[in-house]
A protein has these predicted regions:
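Solvent-exposed loop/turn and edge beta-strand elements of beta-rich ligand-binding domains
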Residues: 1-214
């Protein structure tokens, strides 16, 4: 699971309403996005504890599209007219008519999405680049503002060998799953026949849905 976190700019009048608030996220080849799973959450605080609203792709508040280029995979998230209207004019935060700010002014937006690994990912210290560009524009402006951020995704592998102490037994009947004790989730993975390896595709809190490694 991956997150993009941004602080919405101040919105104080119709002249400062946002007419564009969009993200372009680029992940290096080896980390393709899992499509149709983007969630947007708005919070009153920077720590993301006081939630205002949650949007999914089916709500019509934003659009998510996916392409590829020489750099890797590209995901674009753009607010729709309905989404921008809520960001600009919602009364969920600034309820008093005398308040200067409106909508989700100065609130925190957290975008959550998922991606998986494949055999072209870089393992070890080199890492895999993941860049994001935020673009926004106001009603009273003829230009766009942009903000760029980046991170590196580091990947590692586990080489596990099954053995019976007496050298006997049917290894094909020995299965196991992987659990992260700290965050209390199980690993979901997909087997790549050509690479003879499993690649992590997600996680689940339901042990019955965890991948059974053989």
């Amino acid at each position: 699971e991956y997150q993009i976190i941004s602080t919405l700019p101040s919105i104080t009048s119709a002249a400062s309403y946002l007419t564009d608030y969009s993200f372009i996220d680029t992940a290096e080849k080896g980390i393709p996005y899992l499509q149709n799973g983007v969630t947007l959450e708005f919070f009153k605080d920077a720590a993301c504890t006081d939630k205002i609203a949650t949007w999914t792709e089916t709500d019509g508040k934003f659009n998510a599209s996916y392409t590829t280029n020489d750099a890797g995979y590209v995901m674009s998230i753009t607010m729709t007219e309905s989404g921008l209207s809520e960001i600009n004019t919602s009364k969920a935060v600034y309820t008093d008519a005398s308040m200067v700010n409106s909508g989700y002014s100065d609130c925190t937006l957290r975008i959550t999405y998922s991606a998986q690994l494949d055999k072209s990912a870089n393992y070890g210290d080199k890492g895999n680049t993941n860049d994001v560009v935020l673009t926004w524009k106001r009603t009273n402006s003829s230009y766009y503002d942009t903000l760029v951020d980046d991170c590196h995704v580091y990947v590692f592998g586990l080489d596990l060998t099954k053995k019976f102490s007496d050298g006997k037994g049917d290894l094909s009947k020995v299965e196991f799953c992987l659990q992260n004790d700290a965050d209390d989730y199980y690993v979901v993975a997909k087997y790549d026949e050509s690479a003879k390896a499993y690649y992590v595709t997600g996680s689940t809190d339901d042990k019955a849905k965890a991948t059974r490694f053989t």
